[in-house]
């Protein structure tokens, strides 16, 4: 992996060069929350954010996504987007995108996702954890791939890791704003990462978790928290790896319809409903437990479906904590 340095005085020009790649989207503050939005100036960015409400998956899998329109006897695909830059993506969210890649880019690849993924230029950025983060315990606190370039803050600029062919091309075409990395830069980078590793307050005990879940299907803990859960589905909407959707046709006008796919949630009562009226998960208990098995049942090939970003904890209106639930399930078997 190649390392270069971006001095602080070149940061505004670096941003302008990114705008030449495509539309730039970055974290923007709204009161106490943050969102990825289109930005035209570095002054609009809040690079010291902890997490956005919606993860970057919304740029690849939209909440409401028009697939094609049907007009009389003709089917026309809805025009796709052009190239864009995701500026300031954290390591956990990059790991979330990598999980989506395994799903949507496996044969046969999803054409809508594939097109947007190819059009994306991802700029990662380092962060400091808060009380909700537990990505370190899942190994998603540091990304080695899945990005084009990654920024690590230094006292006098940024250490830039180059992670893709597109990243190499960008650095090569803009050599005038980059410099070589010094031993002092590498030392500062290492010191920051060591400090960051010690800052995590929450961790998930993943040892033998699949076996624990095998034995805990009837645990009373599921019922305890299912009664507290509102069933709103908020945790699935803000999750970087939840990808369930439904497809529906809507009439635009006479003889013209639009086929859409939109977010669905396993917390919705109709999610498990099939023809004949049977529902695979008819109760809130069934749906609550299912999400934990979906996120935490370790697959040797795919790994976990949770990246430890902390969104489900922070944005849960019932204040249910992901790690606490699993800890209680484990303790109930001892």
From Swiss-Prot:
Enzyme Commission numbers on file:
1.12.98.4
Q: Detail which positions bind [4Fe-4S] cluster 2.
A: 306, 309, 312, 316
Top-level taxon in the UniProt lineage: Archaea
The temperature dependence reads: Optimum temperature is greater than 90 degrees Celsius. Activity increases with increasing temperature from 30 degrees Celsius to 90 degrees Celsius. Has a half-life of 6 hours at 95 degrees Celsius.
* Domain 4Fe-4S ferredoxin-type, residue spans: 220-250, 294-328
Q: Does the keyword Metal-binding apply?
A: yes
Catalyzed reactions? n sulfur + H2 = (n-1) sulfur + hydrogen sulfide + H(+)
Chain residues that bind [4Fe-4S] cluster 1: 229, 232, 235, 239
Q: What does this protein do?
A: Part of a bifunctional enzyme complex that functions as a hydrogen-evolving hydrogenase with sulfur-reducing activity. May play a role in hydrogen cycling during fermentative growth. Activity exhibited with NAD in addition to NADPH. The beta and gamma subunits form the sulfur-reducing component that catalyzes the cytoplasmic production of hydrogen sulfide in the presence of elemental sulfur.
Q: How does it assemble?
A: Dimer of heterotetramer of alpha, beta, gamma and delta subunits. The nickel-containing alpha and delta subunits constitute the hydrogenase activity. The beta and gamma subunits (flavin-containing dimer) constitute the sulfur reductase activity.
The protein here is known as: Sulfhydrogenase 2 subunit beta
What organism, scientifically named, is this protein from?
Pyrococcus furiosus (strain ATCC 43587 / DSM 3638 / JCM 8422 / Vc1)
The gene coding this protein: shyB
